[in-house]
Curated annotation (Swiss-Prot):
Signal peptide as annotated in the record: 1-24
Biased composition (Polar residues): 24-44
GO molecular function, one term: enzyme binding
Subcellular localization, as worded in the UniProt entry: Secreted
Family matches, as PANTHER family: STANNIOCALCIN (PTHR11245), STANNIOCALCIN-2 (PTHR11245:SF2)
Coiled-coil positions: none
Record protein name field: Stanniocalcin-2
GO BP terms: calcium ion homeostasis; cellular response to hypoxia; decidualization; embryo implantation; endoplasmic reticulum unfolded protein response; intracellular calcium ion homeostasis; negative regulation of gene expression; negative regulation of multicellular organism growth
Function text: Has an anti-hypocalcemic action on calcium and phosphate homeostasis.
Bias (Basic and acidic residues) ranges: 240-258
């Protein structure tokens, strides 16, 4: 129930977030105000923004956060790249040698890739956003984000702020990658985000965490039960065969009636008690009892 409602809420939010404001306007009545014209261009980067970003990228170097600042305040609303860069640089002194090397190499990788790929991509906002996030993921994985996070868990947790996850998609992408870096990193990041969420939203975070735990909870039926059931089904034909032999033997002995010796009945009971053993041994004992009755 929680998962269904949460899914409906997220779907509705995404629909409103991606809805084109210009959809449904009549082509014979173009918008007159500058706000209407800008709303029509939400789906693609304006020519002015494109020229400004390209000029900014040419002047920015690979070192520092200048390249990422070029993507702030544009019509595609790509926010957060510059903030992540500044956060890494401000906390670089808290990392060990491996972490510092990761920060330097990953930021340089992202800056170099953005500068060379931006001129080759479409001006459509979804294409630009996908290009930005794909390059970010590639650089994080190429320079081993998980190793740096595992050796610097405390610093990584300090860098993550709940409000950034609500406002900037690059932060969400970074946290999603961190959640794949082993149980220690995953637990620390989850605990930190949960605590910050409860400070901001209160009891709503507890409801969301309850829904998430229900979604991720494994099935109650243990997998070991199935092989036991299969073994029980396989053993039933054997028991039916054994019962059939015992019934036939008892019928044959009943027909002989008074001709049978009391010792023969004792041997028959002994054979019945050992029916759980191999069927060949039971049949051999029955044949011996019949031969004994004939001799008598």
């Amino acid at each position: 129930m929680c998962a269904e409602r949460l899914g409906q809420f997220v779907t509705l939010a995404l629909v409103f977030a991606t809805l084109d404001p210009a959809q449904g306007t009549d082509s014979t009545n173009p918008p007159e105000g500058p706000q209407d014209r800008s709303s029509q261009q939400k789906g693609r980067l304006s020519l002015q923004n494109t020229a400004e970003i390209q000029h900014c990228l040419v002047n920015a170097g690979d070192v520092g956060c200048g390249v990422f600042e070029c993507f702030e305040n544009n019509s595609c609303e790509i926010q957060g790249l510059h903030g992540i860069c500044m956060t890494f640089l401000h906390n670089a002194g808290k990392f060990d040698a491996q972490g510092k090397s990761f920060i330097k190499d990953a930021l340089r990788c992202k800056a170099h890739a953005l500068r060379h790929k931006f001129g080759c991509i479409s001006r459509k906002c979804p294409a630009i956003r996908e290009m930005v996030f794909q390059l970010q993921r590639e650089c994080y994985l190429k320079h081993d984000l998980c190793s740096a996070a595992q050796e610097n868990v405390g610093v990584i947790v300090e860098m993550i702020h709940f409000k950034d996850l609500l406002l900037h998609e690059p932060y969400v992408d970074l946290v999603n990658l961190l959640l794949t870096c082993g149980e220690d990193v995953k637990e620390a990041v989850t605990r930190s985000v949960q605590a910050q969420c409860e400070q901001s939203w209160g009891g709503l975070c507890s409801i969301l965490s309850f829904c998430t735990s229900n979604i991720q909870r494994p099935p109650t039926a243990a997998p070991e039960h199935q092989p036991l059931a299969d073994r029980a089904q396989l053993s039933r034909p054997h028991h039916r065969d054994t019962d059939h032999h015992l019934t036939a033997n008892r019928g044959a002995k009943g027909e002989r009636g008074s001709k049978s010796h009391p010792n023969a009945h004792a041997r028959g009971r002994t054979g019945g008690q050992s029916a759980q053993g191999p069927s060949g041994s039971s049949e051999w004992e029955d044949e011996q009892s019949e031969y004994s009755d004939i001799r008598r």
